[in-house]
Amino acid sequence: PRMMRTTLHSSSSLRTRWRKTSNAIMLALTGLAVLIAIVPLFWILAQVFLAGVSALNLDFFTQLPTPAGVPGGGIANALVGSIITVGLGLLIALPIGLLTGFYTATHSNRPLGLAVRFGTDVVAGVPSIVMGLFVYALIVLPQHHFSAWSGGVALAFIMLPIIIRTTEEMIRLVPSSMREGSLALGAPEWKTSLRVVLPAAWNGVLTGVMLAAARAAGEAAPMLFTAFGNPFMSTDISQPIVTLPQTVFVYAISPYPDWQAKAWASALVLIFLVLFLNVTARLIVAW
């Protein structure tokens, strides 16, 4: 019996040591994976910040670009262009996305609902440059010129899947008792959706809209095929317009050191803009 107790105690100690060792190994591997994911991100952010912060000043945000080789100037036209194109995209994508999300949430088992959900997932995986080419063939070629509103349409296609899926998920999270109570009181279905369901899901829906806007604000490829670019200040949606991602692209590939410095600064501004939209979305969820 004493030998049996000694053997059992020894095997129990071995199992305990093995569990502690395996736990330490897994914690180390998990920490290494986190470092591999985080270090490149902070490296990129630090590089962009160090290379771009020196070019930031008041003129950079308020002045128009200068010709190649001429120092000074800014990205005021690109800031305005980004606001216009993202705003146009939201005007198009928001009502369509909300209504489609409502339909797929409330009619998820119908053939049309299943088809819409499948199509949304497919569109979400399409590269943004393909969206730009599609809008180029759909709008730009028939009109024979680039325009801000064609860029807004391209961004709307990019934002739609995000808004649709977010709206659908948020509507599904609303307790069915709220809808049933409103219908039991005699409210029509459209009024129930508008006055009861949507307010209950609005914080989550707004988060999806903010994330969609953040995604669209960083797109350069579709803008090259639709809005094209403009070195001047323009608020005419029927004319070409420039955005921040386009500015980063054009300045970065130029051989002029001043433009390359502005490319880093523009990238820094774009990062802070996207970060602001993402943080705002998180705060909306927390609130």
Would you name each region that the model predicts?
Residues P127, L185-G186, P199:
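Glycine/proline-centered hinge or cleavage motifs at structural transition points of membrane proteins
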Residues V80, I84-I92, I96, T100, ...:
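Hydrophobic alpha-helical transmembrane segments of multipass integral membrane proteins
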Residues G89-T120, L133, A281-W287:
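Transmembrane-helix boundary motif in ABC transporter permease subunits
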Residues E168-R172, L183, M210, V250-W287:
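C-terminal transmembrane helix and the adjacent membrane-cytosol boundary/short C-terminal tail
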Residues H9-L32, A46-G89, N109, V250-A261:
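Periplasmic/extracellular loop-to-transmembrane helix junction in inner-membrane transport proteins
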Residues E189-F225:
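Transmembrane alpha-helices
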Residues A68-G69, M223-I271:
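Interhelical loop and adjacent transmembrane-helix boundary motif
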Residues D121-F157:
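Generic hydrophobic transmembrane alpha-helix motif, especially the helices
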